[in-house]
């Protein structure tokens, strides 16, 4: 885990500091410091990230060669699909994975637009035909992710 985990209230060190102190990183941010239930969820996604090492490496290589972002708007990958130009709450991770996270509190399912083609739900292997909007379950421990099939 990266970043800053408060709360804390540290007075400014001098007039160049707006509070928080220099080099302060907040509270512990290791996976296990968030409690057992959260650890289980974060560990699952950490393991998925490790298993995608080669894919992620290739995305970084592509980015260094032609500037393609790792995280892409839907219209970046599907410029001819007018619906993809309207989507704000789902994205592509590289050219293969469509990610549809939850953005709203107490929401446990969501609509996901699948562009043309065939898409596999990475959680259960179910295959969907693209060109449609589906309803995807999204319990607290499961982010809807769909892999574009060749």
Regions found by a protein language model. Give the residues of each.
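Catalytic-domain carbohydrate-binding cleft regions of carbohydrate-active enzymes
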Residues: 1-150
């Amino acid at each position: 885990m990266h970043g800053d985990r408060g709360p804390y209230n540290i007075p400014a060190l001098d007039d160049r500091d707006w509070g928080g102190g220099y080099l302060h990183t907040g509270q512990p941010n290791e996976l296990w410091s968030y409690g057992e239930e959260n650890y289980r969820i974060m560990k699952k996604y950490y393991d998925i990230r490790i298993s995608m090492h080669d894919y992620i490496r290739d995305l970084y290589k592509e980015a260094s060669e032609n500037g393609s972002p790792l995280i892409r708007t839907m219209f970046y990958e599907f410029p001819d699909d007018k619906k993809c130009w309207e989507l704000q709450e789902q994205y592509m991770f590289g050219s293969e994975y469509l990610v549809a996270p939850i953005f709203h509190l107490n929401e446990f399912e969501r609509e996901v637009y699948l562009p043309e083609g065939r898409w596999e739900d990475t959680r259960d292997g179910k295959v969907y035909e693209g060109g449609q909007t589906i309803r995807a379950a999204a319990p607290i421990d499961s982010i809807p992710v769909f892999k574009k099939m060749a």
